[in-house]
Regions:
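Short, charged, surface-exposed secondary-structure boundary motifs
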Residues: 15, 34-36, 138-140
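ATP-dependent adenylate-forming carboxylate-activation enzymes
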Residues: 3-19, 25, 44-48
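Residue-level signal for well-ordered alpha-helical positions
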Residues: 15-18, 37-38, 185
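Alpha-helix N-cap/helix-start capping motif
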Residues: 9-10, 28-29, 50, 110, ...
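Conserved nucleotide-binding/hydrolysis micro-motifs of P-loop NTPases
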Residues: 11, 30-32, 135
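A short helix-loop-beta submotif of the ANL/AMP-binding
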Residues: 1-4, 124-126
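Alpha-helical "lid/cap" subdomains adjacent to substrate-binding clefts that gate access
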Residues: 21-102
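Conserved AMP-binding/adenylate-forming
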Residues: 24, 64, 81, 85-196
Length: 196
């Protein structure tokens, strides 16, 4: 397993083209830039290319959101058209970004707009949107492979319990992946935990 860490956010494009990751965790801001870049490229394209891009996005949206997301089998012509766009339009976009080998791209740290999530999924970029914290060893909940709902942060991970504190609306999380303490910070640890 090869691990790469991009220490300079301004160099992410260069790093991606060099590393070409299969898995990459990132924040929504990265995907906002991918989305903006794709839309700029579409806008600069000739009329026929714009129509192809738009059809590819429509096809992907229908295939991914109506069939792949629900676990249902897509009609043959739609599946064939989606497969063609995977090898051409979606593939070209992913190669341009450096993510053509990507199997999963967890996204968290801030809200991801439904418009951008829908676009990414429609062009066959395998994002998994979720919620978590350093204190929870990352993921509390995320999109399942099938049955996720855009606009949500997915479903709870196994062995995790979540409730909302009625006094302050704070999210309370319990489970095996929750940290035991802040290192050498007993007061912060005490403040971070409820009695149960």
């Amino acid at each position: 397993v090869r691990i790469a860490i991009n220490r300079d956010p301004k160099a992410i494009r260069k790093t991606l083209l060099e590393v070409r990751p299969t898995l990459m965790c990132n924040v929504p801001r990265f995907w906002e830039k991918v989305y903006a870049g794709a839309n700029e490229r579409i806008a600069r394209s000739s009329g026929p290319l714009q129509r192809i891009f738009q059809d590819a996005i429509r096809t992907g949206r229908e295939y991914v959101l109506n069939y792949r997301r629900t676990g249902e089998k897509a009609p043959r012509t739609l599946a064939l058209k989606f497969g063609l766009y995977q090898k051409t339009v979606y593939g070209a976009l992913k190669r341009a970004v450096g993510i053509e080998h990507g199997n999963i791209f967890p996204v968290a740290g801030a809200p991801l707009s439904d418009e951008i999530a829908e676009f990414l999924l429609s062009v066959d970029i395998p994002i998994v949107y979720g919620y978590g914290l350093s204190e929870t060893s990352a993921t509390v909940c995320c999109y399942p492979t099938v049955g996720y709902t855009l606009g949500s942060i997915g479903t709870l991970m196994p062995d995790i319990d979540v409730r909302i504190d009625p006094e302050n609306n704070e999210i309370l999380v319990r489970g095996k992946t929750i940290m035991r303490e802040y290192y050498r910070k007993p007061e912060e640890t005490r403040c971070a935990f409820t009695p149960d």
